Curated annotation (Swiss-Prot):
Binds the 23S rRNA. InterPro entries: Ribosomal_bL28/bL31-like_sf, Ribosomal_bL31, Ribosomal_bL31_B, Ribosomal_bL31_sf. The keyword Hydrolase does not apply. The keyword Nucleotide-binding does not apply. GO terms for cellular component: ribonucleoprotein complex; ribosome. One of its GO terms (molecular function) is rRNA binding. GO terms for biological process: translation. Belongs to the bacterial ribosomal protein bL31 family. Type A subfamily. Keywords: Ribonucleoprotein, Ribosomal protein, RNA-binding, rRNA-binding. This is Large ribosomal subunit protein bL31. PANTHER family: 50S RIBOSOMAL PROTEIN L31, CHLOROPLASTIC, LARGE RIBOSOMAL SUBUNIT PROTEIN BL31C.
Length: 81
């Protein structure tokens, strides 16, 4: 491989919104850091991961879409006439 043309590929911690963390490698190196297994690593925050996604956990979660629609209609005065 040629030197100087490839991005750095370092260890980072990915953390989902549920607080689950896992260590992997990435070319994206953020400034924010966290401690994982006693060492300091850069951290990338993600919404969901394989530890929290319903497909991988087998949990069913109900999303309140009806409440969201009502909130939208109320916000823009689109209620029933």
């Amino acid at each position: 491989m040629k030197k100087g043309i490839h991005p750095e590929f370092d260890l980072v911690v990915f953390e989902d919104m549920a607080g689950n963390q896992f260590l992997t490698r990435s070319t994206k190196i953020p400034k924010e850091t966290t401690t994982f297994e006693g060492k300091e690593y850069p951290v990338i925050k993600v919404a969901v991961s394989s530890k929290s996604h319903p497909f991988y956990t087998g949990e069913q979660r109900f999303v309140d879409t009806a409440g969201r629609v009502d909130k939208f209609n109320k916000k823009f005065n689109l209620g029933k006439k």
